[in-house]
Regions:
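Residue-level signal for short, function-critical loop segments
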Residues: 92-93, 127, 190-192, 415-417
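N-terminal extension/subdomain marker
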Residues: 34-180, 482
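Bacterial N-terminal signal peptides
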Residues: 14-21
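Terminal, contiguous helix-loop blocks that mediate binding/assembly
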Residues: 40-79, 194-195, 199-482
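Catalytic-core segments of thiol-dependent peptidases
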Residues: 125-226, 236-237, 242-243, 259-260
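Structural recognition of the beta-strand scaffold that forms the well-ordered cores
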Residues: 85-90, 120-125, 184-188, 230-234, ...
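Bacterial N-terminal signal peptides that target proteins for export
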Residues: 2-13
Length: 482
């Protein structure tokens, strides 16, 4: 793939981060206006150097925060738990300023009856233009600590850019340094846009964290302390993907995240009632989080059927990721070798049938598909595909869903998206170094569709693809013309 200029990459992000809308459920994907403003800002200020592999960088340059967090004085606090410290990075965004969802989740945390004598629930709240409750200000970021009487403010700072990796790493270092415990975990709360778009929207600074920025923040905190987090959870949409897992794997043991969009109410924080005077392993906590999320969703749907939405939440073993990536890389090497204009129609047909995510509640096609369903449909009983599926299944500790063919973890395989989004996906994969044979396969797949030369210099004629759906929703090779 040719080297792209920084200007080109900014343009790609500016185009792809636009067509997302919120539904009546106030889903946690990122809204149109905020992304458009973010990318307008990024286009004016991005000066990030190219990545070392020569394919540029796909992230936005963050506007500097004011300063890293200074040291705190917590002598006035009665107790500090020593069993678990759970840090919540609460980027309020429009979810708070328009709907008060962040304040509602703080209420849920207080109501959970947490054992605060042994556990620290530490919140860094900011990123909203205004707060509906709790006396918080959009001009400030506030550190909150949960006590037996509720949240108390520990420190307050001028508004920090929560889309800057320095802000996240500073908060994590703050938690490590001043709230020591036997186990640490992190919740990332806000909008999510999958691996291409990233996580979080700071309304005040018009910024978000892309995956490379998230990696930077974790490296400068978790990596610097050489203490793995027990788990990282995304109370955000579309973040349960292998690409996200590849970023988190060096820094945590488990990930809890959703393949699909989340309703505006997000997680049910009643799971915090399970905290005790003993460390709860990440896989066990993952089950608590998944079950409480699914149970609450079904409860809401029973009383308010008009709010029904697709639900997914999974607990992923990050220590099993390396074997899964290797197996996937082997399979896509095999698939790419056999890819030509003759078998392309079968791939198109099966890609169109794979369970995808994010399209239910938005006008944007994120290209996120279920990995296991993809391998089932395109694998064609290949031993390599079966080995890859087994390795991926080994990563999925626990999952809950009300959808068919939602196995627990996704991969980004853009299909009926525009070229700009596809280019940004490829750029992201190169930047992360994720499964190189998968990236190569995608480039060859798109080359056939565009009538270009394959990476292996296989010439094909110009091709146009037309897929029609039969009345029963099935696809047939005769439905696909080249």
């Amino acid at each position: 793939m040719k080297k792209r200029t920084k200007k080109k990459l900014r343009a790609l992000l500016g185009l792809l981060l636009v067509p997302v809308v919120l539904t009546g459920c106030r889903i946690r994907t990122t809204p149109v206006g905020v992304f458009a403003q973010i990318m307008e800002y990024a286009g004016q200020n991005n000066s990030q150097a190219s990545s070392s592999h020569g394919h540029g960088t796909y992230h936005t340059e963050s506007q500097p925060s004011s300063t890293p967090m200074p040291q705190m004085d917590y002598d006035s606090l009665d107790t500090i738990g020593e069993v678990q410290t759970i840090m919540v990075y609460l980027v309020g965004s429009d979810l708070e300023s328009d709907y008060g969802n962040a304040s509602l989740d703080l209420d849920e945390m207080e109501a959970a009856g947490v054992d605060t004598a042994h556990n620290n629930i530490l919140v860094y709240a900011g990123g909203a233009s205004e707060w509906q409750d709790r006396g918080l200000s959009g001009d400030e970021c506030t550190v909150l600590l949960l006590t037996d009487t509720g949240f108390v403010p520990v420190d307050t700072y001028p508004a920090e850019n929560m889309g800057d990796p320095l802000t996240l790493s500073s908060f994590l270092n703050y938690g490590f340094d001043f709230f020591p415990a036997d186990s640490y975990s992190l919740i990332l709360w806000d909008h999510g846009g999958g691996p291409v778009l990233g996580y979080g929207v700071d309304e005040n600074f018009r910024d978000l964290l892309t995956l490379d920025e998230l990696s930077e923040a974790l490296g400068d905190s978790v990596g610097a302390h050489m203490t793995k987090l027990e788990w990282i959870g995304f109370d955000a949409c579309l973040m349960s993907s292998l690409e996200v897992v590849s970023v988190l794997a060096p820094y945590a043991n488990y990930m809890i995240a959703s393949q699909e969009t989340e309703p505006g109410w997000g997680w049910n924080y009643d799971f915090l009632s399970e905290l005790s005077d003993e460390v709860i392993p990440g896989d066990v906590m993952g089950e608590y989080i998944v079950d409480s999320y699914m149970d609450y969703g079904e409860y809401v749907f029973d009383y308010y059927p008009n709010l029904y939405s697709d639900l997914t939440l999974s607990c992923i073993d990050l220590n099993a990721y390396a074997e899964a990536e290797e197996a996937l890389n082997d399979y896509f090497a095999e698939l790419d070798t056999s890819l030509d204009v003759q078998n392309y129609p079968r791939l198109v047909r099966n890609r169109a049938r794979v369970r995808d995510f994010g399209t239910y509640s938005s006008d944007m096609d994120y290209g996120m598909v279920d990995v296991l369903h993809l391998l089932e449909l395109v694998g064609n009983d290949s031993e390599a595909a079966q080995a890859a599926a087994e390795a991926v299944e080994n990563c999925i500790v626990y999952s809950g869903t009300n959808m068919d063919n939602a196995g627990g973890i996704s991969i980004c395989y853009p299909y009926q998206t525009d070229a700009d989004y596809r280019d940004a996906c490829i750029e992201m994969l190169y930047y992360l170094g994720f499964a190189p044979n998968y990236t190569r396969f995608l480039e060859d797949f798109y080359a056939i569709e565009n009538g270009d030369t394959l990476l292996a210099d296989r010439e094909i004629s110009n091709a146009e693809t037309s897929v029609t759906t039969q009345n029963d929703g099935a696809y047939d090779e005769s439905d696909i013309t080249l």
